[in-house]
């Protein structure tokens, strides 16, 4: 169960004296490094995202998700899994590439309103919000590289990345139980008479962090059926879900999910199955683990990208696992955002930064949950390699250089789906 007493480090990134080269910058830079070394993430206070803009992005998401399904389905992109996703009407999401650039957001709104000029107000709100999240990402990446003495690589590093924004909606859990279980969702779907879903069988629950889940819009859930999704949560069975493909439900199988352009979710096979979830983490989950796994909206995983900046607004759900195996329940606060390091950053920093396991539990009833996130991803063909300055006798090279896309080819291979630690299995230096 997530602890309310444990909290992530809170770091103020909006101090007026926070300028590169200043004493305040050095102080905050040290705090950021320590937080990422110890937790792999932190809560960033950033009041440059005004409350007015926060409310505007919330209203924008409400307006967008209120559109007819056929309208939202116009959100398509040549790159796979960047557009609209609908997971059994339990959750849905919209995706935009490099949303910090207004032209890209205009293309997105023109997809939804092709007969006009898009929607200027919505475009501007999304672009302004994405721009602020990108500011946080760039500041944190500068601080990280400076703190390790590799600031000479900053400009090239920033040019080697791109952003994926995803707007997400989750329906409120059924009334009567704030601690909603997977079975509750199955029962709800049965009552709604959604095609392909029967009570007390596999149910798809959408992800949140790095949770652009690559899934086909429909899920045929049922014992012996195929699941056209990535992250499946199955009653008493595990799901071996292959990225963007049909996966057979199988006892003891693993879940391997891909997210928007490689922001990955990896939930391994060969681990203990928690009663009535079938969704297990890379760590063994005992059936009596406080029954917490029953309440997951996203099983325990690490991100595969560089950084994620998440806006939870008022409804909590994110939980982060500490080094000593305790869970921190992250409670949203005004003007705060969660910054999470991914496996790619861990490799780039030669293991000096940890990529934390985290999960999402959907527990608050009666309120629809909206979240927005920016995912920082390496551009195609970018090779991730720790700089020589981070390799010495005390810190031997931990990972071989690798192409980001090649990592995901392995990640979704038959062998990759059976492995607990994808990054280590794919590119760890054997002598390390």
Curated annotation (Swiss-Prot):
Oxidoreductase among keywords: yes
Gene Ontology biological process: glucosinolate biosynthetic process
Positions contributing to Fe cation binding: 301, 303, 358
Record carries keyword Metal-binding: yes
Cofactor requirements of the protein: Fe(2+)
Top EC group: oxidoreductase
Note on how the cofactor is bound: Binds 1 Fe(2+) ion per subunit.
Annotated Gene3D superfamilies: B-lactam Antibiotic, Isopenicillin N Synthase, Chain (2.60.120.330)
InterPro entries documented for this protein: DIOX_N, IPNS-like_FE2OG_OXY, IPNS-like_sf, Iron_ascorbate_oxido_reductase, Oxoglu/Fe-dep_dioxygenase_dom
Residues where 2-oxoglutarate binds: 369
E.C. designation(s): 1.14.11.-
GO MF entries: 2-oxoglutarate-dependent dioxygenase activity; metal ion binding
Superkingdom: Eukaryota
Keywords in alphabetical order: Dioxygenase, Iron, Metal-binding, Oxidoreductase
Family classification: Belongs to the iron/ascorbate-dependent oxidoreductase family.
Function, in words: 2-oxoglutarate-dependent dioxygenase involved in glucosinolates biosynthesis. Catalyzes the conversion of methylsulfinylalkyl glucosinolates to alkenyl glucosinolates.
Name of the protein in question: 2-oxoglutarate-dependent dioxygenase AOP2
Species for this entry: Arabidopsis thaliana (Mouse-ear cress)
């Amino acid at each position: 169960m997530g602890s309310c007493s444990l909290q992530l480090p809170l770091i103020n990134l909006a101090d007026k004296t926070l300028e590169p080269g200043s004493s305040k910058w050095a102080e905050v830079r040290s705090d950021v490094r320590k937080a990422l070394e110890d937790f792999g993430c932190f809560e960033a206070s950033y009041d440059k995202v005004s409350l007015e803009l926060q409310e505007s992005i919330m209203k924008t998401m409400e307006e967008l998700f209120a559109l007819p399904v056929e309208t939202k389905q116009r959100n398509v992109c040549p790159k796979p899994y960047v557009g609209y996703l609908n997971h059994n009407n339990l959750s849905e999401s919209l995706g935009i590439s490099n949303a910090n650039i207004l032209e890209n957001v205009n293309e997105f709104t023109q997809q939804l309103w092709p007969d006009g000029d898009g929607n200027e107000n919505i475009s501007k709100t999304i672009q302004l919000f994405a721009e602020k999240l990108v500011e946080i990402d760039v500041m944190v990446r500068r601080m990280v590289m400076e703190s390790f003495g590799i600031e000479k690589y900053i400009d090239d590093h920033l040019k080697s990345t791109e952003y994926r924004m995803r707007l997400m909606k989750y329906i409120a859990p059924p009334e009567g139980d704030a601690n909603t279980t997977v079975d509750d969702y199955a029962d709800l779907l049965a009552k709604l008479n959604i095609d392909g879903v029967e009570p007390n069988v596999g149910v798809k629950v959408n992800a949140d962090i790095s949770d652009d889940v690559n899934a086909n819009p429909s899920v045929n859930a049922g014992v012996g059926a195929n699941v056209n999704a990535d992250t499946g949560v199955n009653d008493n069975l595990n799901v071996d879900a292959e990225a963007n493909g049909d996966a057979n439900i199988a006892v003891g199988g693993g879940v391997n999910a891909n997210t928007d352009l490689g922001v990955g979710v990896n939930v391994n096979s060969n681990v203990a199955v928690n009663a009535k979830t079938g969704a297990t983490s890379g760590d063994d989950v005992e059936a009596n683990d406080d029954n917490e796994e029953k309440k997951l909206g996203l099983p325990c995983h690490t991100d595969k990208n560089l950084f994620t900046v998440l806006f939870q607004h008022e409804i909590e759900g994110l939980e982060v696992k500490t080094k000593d195996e305790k869970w921190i329940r992250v409670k949203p606060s005004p003007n705060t955002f969660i910054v999470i390091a991914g496996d790619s950053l861990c490799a780039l920093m030669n293991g000096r930064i940890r990529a934390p396991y985290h999960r999402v539990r959907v527990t608050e009833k009666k309120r629809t949950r909206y979240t927005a996130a920016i995912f920082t991803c390496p551009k195609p063909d970018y090779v991730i390699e720790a700089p020589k300055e981070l390799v010495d006798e005390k810190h031997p090279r931990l990972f071989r250089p690798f192409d980001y896309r090649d990592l995901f080819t392995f990640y979704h291979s038959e062998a990759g789906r059976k492995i607990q630690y994808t990054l280590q299995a794919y590119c760890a230096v054997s002598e390390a």
